[in-house]
């Protein structure tokens, strides 16, 4: 029998913590379900129509660049090879960024498709998409980074390598 699909995340509720070492050793933000304004005031928002952590498809997350804690203020510093680590309290999920930030228009919703083709991906996988506004104090464009799931491990086994450097 196939494993049961995970239960849906609860709207506007936190379900994970995200760590991006490139943005600082103390940088971590809650990830909540949904991308409504009130949700993004509290942390990062998971696009509800995208896959869940570690699942096949595209786990996509939005965050403000400025305002509400400036979670993605330093987004342009992200580089290929950078780790994005998430935990849901049970497991660690380490994604690795594959490309430098890509600038596009807000109407370019294909960036969060299950296989985001502008990323260069051509087949199904376990992907991560991060989105934020550009310019820093505006919202005429979006910056996007894409990554792939590199590893998972239970929380009991300790922090992943990317957080121990």
Regions found by a protein language model. Give the residues of each.
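Extended boundary segments
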Residues: 2-48, 163-164
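Extracytoplasmic/periplasmic soluble domains downstream of a signal peptide or transmembrane helix
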Residues: 36-50, 55-165
């Amino acid at each position: 029998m196939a494993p049961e699909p995970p239960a849906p995340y609860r709207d506007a509720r936190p379900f994970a913590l995200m760590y991006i070492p490139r943005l600082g050793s103390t940088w971590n933000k809650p990830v909540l379900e949904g991308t409504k304004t009130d949700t993004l005031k509290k942390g990062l928002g998971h696009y509800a129509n995208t896959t869940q952590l570690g699942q096949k498809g595209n786990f996509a997350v939005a965050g403000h660049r400025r305002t509400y804690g400036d979670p993605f203020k330093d987004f342009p510093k992200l580089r290929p090879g950078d780790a994005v680590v998430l935990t849901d309290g049970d497991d660690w999920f380490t994604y690795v960024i594959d490309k430098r930030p890509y600038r596009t228009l807000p109407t370019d919703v294909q960036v969060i498709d299950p296989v985001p083709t502008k990323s260069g991906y051509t087949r199904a996988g376990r992907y991560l998409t991060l989105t934020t506004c550009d310019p820093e104090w505006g919202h005429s464009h979006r910056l996007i980074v894409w990554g792939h799931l590199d590893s998972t491990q239970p929380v009991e086994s300790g922090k992943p390598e990317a957080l121990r450097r």
